């Protein structure tokens, strides 16, 4: 009996009393529940701040909060409160605390314990990953915990009943919706979010596969992003191909216009005299340069020849180095001009001097008192130069160097010629002119050179 009493005393002294163990655990849990996490506290302060209501604020009834401007929220507020500017990281944090996205077209989040004017409920919001890990791998019961459980079952200790409600947020945390921060990046994010919501609702009630469900969600998200990246790559390649096709079409059209514009010039001749097939077509010139200033004389001559061939009518005017110099003046025209002048024929009729007929004239002029300037019906191939004679009164020469224009007696009277002497002088001048013209015409005809019609 003494040995049994000593053993009981040793056993009682070796293990702490069950009431003390449960009291310490309850105090620790109560201390944890008394203060919310810094993330929840800062988020609540952001939503409550009226100065940033245009960026983030409560909804009408205060049950949810809305991020109206995600870009400004990430740029201005996140670095101030959370030391980063990643909006996706903020959304993932909300997801771990059980927040759910209400509508797909707006960043509106809700939680049963996150309401306007009820800040005390923030203590009931816990991280979902910690609870899931504790539920997935429960520790083996120790002898002390078994004794505490027996004491609770017997009703001896009532303080230990306080920590039991801590499992209630697990049901609220396992909400059937997950927040998706990648919805702003792709139009297919709605279906991915629904898929993740279905997977989350299926795994939350069990509680045992929380860690594996989170890993599966990350894998599915990576796969979705990979598919999205591949799709964008294909679209980019398609757009590049379209741009290349448009550029090729425009270059072909420009080349066609270039060939059509320069085909008429390049097919005739080139400035160096080489074949146009061996030389690439010249670049097109502006219309003003093409019309007013040809690139070379060869092209100008060829273009003129082509224009004559197209018209089909020969140019009656004579040309000197490709330039028209007017119609050739025939003997008929020369005779008509002489008739209009009337000077030469009248003087020839008075004198009756004969002009030697030309060899090519089939009807020579008659001698005697006939006119020597009668036009033959057949025109000669060379022009006749008939200048209009100019007559001046003949004054006698001076008698001496000191008596210029004065008579013997010192008078300044001039001595004029008689009518017969003046007529003889005119006849002599006409004969000399006719001989000069005939001699010049024969010499020019013998050398094969035609006149210019002057």
From Swiss-Prot:
It is found in: Nucleus. InterPro entries: HSF_DNA-bd, WH-like_DNA-bd_sf, WH_DNA-bd_sf. SMART domains: HSF (SM00415). Residues 347-361 have a biased composition (Basic and acidic residues). Residues 172-222, 333-421 are annotated as: Disordered. A motif (Nuclear localization signal) lies at residues 328-331. Keywords: Coiled coil, DNA-binding, Nucleus, Phosphoprotein, Stress response, Transcription, Transcription regulation. Residues 203-217 have a biased composition (Gly residues). GO terms for molecular function: DNA-binding transcription factor activity; sequence-specific DNA binding. Residues 225-254 are annotated as: Hydrophobic repeat HR-A/B. Residues 182-191 have a biased composition (Polar residues). PROSITE patterns: HSF_DOMAIN. Exhibits temperature-dependent phosphorylation. GO terms for biological process: regulation of transcription by RNA polymerase II. GO terms for cellular component: nucleus. Residues 216-246 form a coiled coil. Its main location: nucleus. The hydrophobic-rich region (HR-A/B) corresponds to the oligomerization domain. Homotrimer. Belongs to the HSF family. Class B subfamily. Transcriptional regulator that specifically binds DNA of heat shock promoter elements (HSE). This is Heat stress transcription factor B-2c. It comes from Oryza sativa subsp. japonica (Rice). The lineage of its organism: Eukaryota, Viridiplantae, Streptophyta, Embryophyta, Tracheophyta. The gene is HSFB2C.
